[in-house]
Regions:
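Acidic, glycine/proline-rich Ca2+-coordinating loop motifs
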Residues: 1-182
């Protein structure tokens, strides 16, 4: 794969259930090598949020050692993303791999696999996009497991402050970090 974007992590998944592992790449931001922004204050070093976010990428494994970028066709193109990492799991228990993207200082994305080669972004709709106070947080590396043995995967998301423990309750995710003792 030849991709000039600043990638921070990736997740292998068989999103189309053809038996080949496809690759989701969590891209962070648009960074032009050799081109820097000028800041004049003494503490004015450009931090990551000084640069534009960039879309993640989904590469379909063609089964012959090559991959094809299907990000736009799959409905996963989001030009303003700032992905720190992603995890692939069947979060809605329909047998198809979904993708959860942890973004930096903005809403997180949940791409639900529709089973036809496309995804629908449903993070806000299901309570997976924002922190417990309704704000974007500096999400890092999400991990999934069925922590309460209810048959639904829960998502632990560390961040720069307190983190989130998202558990599905009545069709929506609730942040249980405060009551969990974590």
């Amino acid at each position: 794969l030849s991709d000039p974007r600043w990638a921070l992590s990736g997740a292998w998944l068989d999103y189309d259930r053809d038996g080949d592992l496809d690759l989701f790449v969590a891209n962070y931001l648009e960074y032009d090598e050799g081109k820097f922004r000028s800041f004049y204050a003494a503490s004015g070093y450009p931090g990551p949020l000084s640069y534009n976010g960039v879309s993640c990428a989904l590469y379909r494994n063609e089964g012959n050692g090559t991959f094809t970028d299907v990000t736009k066709a799959a409905g996963m193109h989001n030009a303003g993303g700032r992905a720190m990492s992603a995890v692939a799991a069947d979060l809605n228990n329909d047998g198809w791999m979904d993708v959860y993207v942890a973004n930096d200082s903005m809403e997180n994305y949940y791409y639900e696999n529709k089973g036809d080669g496309t995804f629908a972004e449903k993070g806000l709709e299901l309570g997976l996009a924002l922190g417990q106070n309704g704000q974007g947080v500096s999400s890092m590396g999400p991990a999934v497991a069925d922590l309460d043995a209810d048959g639904e995967l829960d998502i632990m998301i560390p961040d720069m402050d307190y983190g989130s423990l998202l558990s599905k309750r009545g069709g929506f995710y609730q942040d249980l970090i405060g009551s969990s003792g974590l």
